[in-house]
Amino acid sequence: MALSKDDVLNAIAEMSVMDIVELISAMEEKFGVTAAVAAAPAAAGPAAAAAEEKDEFDVVLASFGEKKVGVIKAVREATGLGLKEAKDLVESAPAPIKEGVNKAEAEELKKKLEEAGATVELK
C-alpha cells in the first residue's frame, strides 16, 4: 500500500524540527541534491535598461537662467498656476514642473521652457 501525498504531509506535520532536519539531510544524500536556496539572478545590466524605454517622464526645471520673467510665463502656461505660485516654483529650482507625462508632451514642454531661457531636465 503506497502512501498518498496527504499521508506524507500529515506525517511531516507531526514531526519535530530535529526530525525534519534529519529527513532533509537523508533526502539530500539519497537523491544527490541540496536544499540550499539558489542564488538570485544578477540584475539586468545597462543594455537591458536601455531596451526598456521610459514612457512617463518628469519635467524638472534645473535653473531659470537670465530670463526669469519669460520662464515664469512659460511655467504658468504649462501648469495653469497663478503668478505667485509660478514665481515661487521657478525660484525654487531645481523643481519638478510636471510629473508622469508622456514623451511627446515632455519634449514639447522642455522645448518651450528652454526657448524661454530655462535649463530643463527630463527624468
From Swiss-Prot:
The keyword Glycosyltransferase does not apply. One of its GO terms (biological process) is translation. Keywords: Ribonucleoprotein, Ribosomal protein. GO terms for cellular component: cytosolic large ribosomal subunit. Pfam families: Ribosomal_L12, Ribosomal_L12_N. One of its GO terms (molecular function) is mRNA binding. InterPro entries: Ribosomal_bL12 (IPR000206), Ribosomal_bL12_C (IPR013823), Ribosomal_bL12_C/ClpS-like (IPR014719), Ribosomal_bL12_oligo (IPR008932), Ribosomal_bL12_oligo_N_sf (IPR036235). The keyword Ribonucleoprotein applies. Belongs to the bacterial ribosomal protein bL12 family. Forms part of the ribosomal stalk which helps the ribosome interact with GTP-bound translation factors. Is thus essential for accurate translation. Homodimer. Part of the ribosomal stalk of the 50S ribosomal subunit. Forms a multimeric L10(L12)X complex, where L10 forms an elongated spine to which 2 to 4 L12 dimers bind in a sequential fashion. Binds GTP-bound translation factors. This is Large ribosomal subunit protein bL12. It comes from Psychrobacter cryohalolentis (strain ATCC BAA-1226 / DSM 17306 / VKM B-2378 / K5).
